[in-house]
């Protein structure tokens, strides 16, 4: 009888620990409270104007597209931001040479440059359940324009040819069909990669990217939860 009671006590403690673990894990993937985010954004940036409609449309997309296949989610998100935003240089939009805007800032402006498109698509797909290891924000050289450029790449598996989500074109194509892009480095919430690194090995973490860290801080100020890995 004593052994039976000891067993039940252990199982109760195990169950409590499991429940607490699930609660903590749920906290790490907390819901995005768009009412609070809009209030915070207005306090930080002033009246949202037409940006509120774009933010509402983004919220609707995130709430309704999770049932799609991953490739379908790529297409929906890619088309959404390519249509909701117009291209504008940082110096004209933010009076800075290189500024990484949050998705909220980009939607308020209805504009951004290449990294702003890639960043907004990355966070959207992460929110829609695409694992971070399948997504990389990739810095490339656009050979036709002879300039730096940034895109989002998607790997269906670690050895797959990535698909490229680009602000320059709506079509999502394999990297093998984008000879106009020369990759330089890539990153996500978990690491940093250099083009040509053997075995796709990470060469560091995103703590080395000060603009990425600043971006996460801005998103937290806007009301997004502080998640350990985006």
Can you annotate each of these PLM segments?
Residues 3-16:
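Bacterial N-terminal signal peptides that target proteins for export
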Residues 6, 23-25, 29-30:
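Intrinsic disorder/low-complexity segments in short proteins, especially the signal peptide
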Residues 15-23:
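Bacterial N-terminal signal peptides
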Residues 28-230:
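A structural boundary/capping signal
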């Amino acid at each position: 009888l004593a052994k039976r009671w000891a067993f039940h006590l252990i199982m109760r403690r195990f169950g409590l620990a499991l429940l607490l673990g699930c609660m903590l894990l749920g906290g790490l993937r907390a819901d995005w409270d768009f009412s609070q985010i809009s209030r915070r954004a207005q306090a930080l940036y002033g009246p949202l104007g037409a940006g509120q409609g774009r933010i509402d449309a983004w919220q609707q997309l995130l709430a309704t597209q999770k049932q799609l296949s991953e490739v379908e989610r790529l297409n929906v998100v890619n088309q959404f931001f390519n249509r909701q935003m117009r291209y504008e240089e940082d110096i004209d939009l933010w009076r800075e040479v290189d500024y990484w805007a949050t998705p909220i800032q980009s939607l308020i402006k209805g504009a951004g440059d290449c990294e702003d498109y890639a960043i907004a698509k990355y966070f959207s797909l992460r929110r829609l359940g695409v694992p971070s290891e399948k997504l990389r924000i990739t810095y490339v050289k656009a050979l036709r324009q002879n300039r730096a450029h940034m895109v989002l790449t998607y790997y269906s598996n670690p050895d797959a040819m990535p698909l490229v989500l680009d602000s320059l074109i709506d079509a999502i194509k394999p990297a093998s069909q984008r000879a106009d892009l020369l990759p330089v480095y890539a990153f996500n919430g978990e690491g940093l990669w250099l083009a040509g690194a053997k075995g796709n090995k990470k060469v560091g973490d995103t703590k080395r990217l000060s603009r990425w860290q600043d971006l996460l801080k801005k998103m937290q100020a806007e009301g997004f939860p502080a998640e350990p890995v985006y």
